[in-house]
């Protein structure tokens, strides 16, 4: 669930490439032919995530800061949300029309390991399934650009086969807590030491794992 952003997602006909950068170099000398995506039309207005109280220490939850920044951009008709260098721990990010989420080099958007933060709520009622870390529904002119990283924190979501990891890695997983099944051949991030479950069984919890990014 980790993805380096060189040229990533956009919406409708607007798969995007650029905000103050030339991504053409990433299309040179490829083993297969790829067309560069069509640029989204983003207003010439920008805000920095830190303007809304975000702290890039990898520990502070910045969900509210993302919400405030996107709300500000939406009021202005859109623009660029600059995510500077740092590790920006967050829950769900919901993009709106005409917004470019731009990750500068060495910027990491890190999904919170608290899985309870990955549900949307309406009128105080929580959805039955987790939502993608970054999403948008029925929106237009959305782009995600830059040379940063979006890290979905997959270690707290996906099961691990004993045969696929080293002894050191296996020990590290089990130090998180978790549950072994299949005679110790499979580890699930269920009953972790520091984070609660979101289902009654390891298998049911695994079925709730969702996409990193979804634009519909």
Predicted regions and their residues:
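Extracellular "leader-to-stem" segments immediately downstream of a signal peptide or signal-anchor
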Residues: 2-82, 87-100, 104-216
